[in-house]
């Protein structure tokens, strides 16, 4: 676990959406109901599309400051990876008999993605996807509207939120992969899917780079700025808990 959570007093909240999450614990024990995992798969497929839009907003807000010169290319690489992630989600969903919806396609460029109206994107999703769950809608609204390109949010808040969301997945799925029960009983397809986040050196490196950026932000932030960052991270952790728990509840 990153010491950033400890410094911000968010250790318990981070644990709640990683190792202490009922969804993650059941997944690690290979006891999660298929219906709950399939619900998460369906909802997260939608979420990734909106997350890509949020990432484009974050890239556009990287300051022209030498100390952040390393960041833009890394984030652009992350944007490209999300396209592959959606393909993998769709493939795994098909393997499990889950029909994922047709979503607005990725824009050809970051500029084109930024030109999309965030609120309109969400309206389109709500109209077209009958199973767009409230917990997913809340998370997507936070990212695309509250922190979107047309919002008053800062780079500091966006990069902290991006990092928090990514390190939750990294940590949660590393926990799953370390489980002896999971390694003994899970199928190879599921193991491979979890390794996309929890066993992927490139994803480790990506999250490490985001961590460096967040530390730089906190080093120079005012007390008010630190509080804004903390609120953003705490919001992500709360929304992650709702996403895991909502998937479990919907799958009953």
Regions found by a protein language model. Give the residues of each.
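Secondary-structure edge/capping motif, primarily at the C-terminal ends of alpha-helices
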Residues: 27, 58-62, 146-150, 173-180, ...
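Amphipathic, well-ordered alpha-helical segments in soluble domains
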Residues: 16-20, 47-54, 85, 135, ...
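Acidic, low-complexity proline/glycine-rich segments
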Residues: 1-24, 201-212
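Long amphipathic all-alpha helical oligomerization modules
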Residues: 199-233
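Helix-loop segments that flank and shape redox-cofactor active sites
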Residues: 22-35, 52-73, 148-151
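Alpha-helical bundle segments that constitute or directly flank the non-heme di-iron/ferroxidase center
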Residues: 12-13, 32-61, 80-81, 160-171
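A cross-kingdom marker for long, charged
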Residues: 227-252
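Active-site-proximal alpha-helical scaffolds that flank and shape metal-associated catalytic sites
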Residues: 68-205, 238
């Amino acid at each position: 676990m990153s010491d950033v959570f400890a410094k911000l007093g968010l250790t318990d909240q981070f644990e709640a959406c990683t190792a202490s999450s009922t969804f993650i614990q059941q997944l690690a024990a290979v006891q999660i109901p298929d219906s709950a995992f399939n619900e998460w798969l369906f909802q997260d497929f939608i979420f990734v599309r909106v997350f890509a839009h949020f990432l484009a907003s974050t890239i556009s807000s990287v300051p022209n400051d030498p100390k952040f010169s390393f960041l833009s290319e890394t984030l652009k690489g992350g944007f490209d990876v999300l396209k592959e992630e959606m393909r993998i989600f769709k493939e795994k969903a098909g393997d499990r008999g889950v029909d994922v919806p047709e979503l607005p396609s990725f824009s050809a460029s970051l500029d084109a993605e930024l030109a999309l109206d965030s609120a309109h994107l969400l309206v389109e999703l709500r109209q077209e996807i009958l199973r767009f769950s409230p917990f997913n809608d809340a998370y997507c609204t936070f990212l695309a509207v509250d922190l979107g390109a047309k919002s008053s949010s800062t780079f500091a808040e966006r990069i902290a939120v991006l990092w928090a969301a990514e390190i939750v997945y990294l940590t949660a799925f590393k926990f799953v992969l370390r489980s002896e029960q999971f390694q003994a009983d899970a199928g190879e397809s599921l193991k491979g899917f979890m390794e996309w986040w929890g066993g992927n050196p490139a994803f480790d490196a990506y999250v490490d780079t985001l961590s460096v950026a967040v530390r730089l932000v906190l080093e120079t932030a005012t007390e008010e700025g630190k509080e804004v960052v903390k609120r953003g991270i705490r919001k992500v952790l709360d929304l992650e808990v709702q996403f895991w728990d909502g998937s479990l509840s919907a799958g009953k």
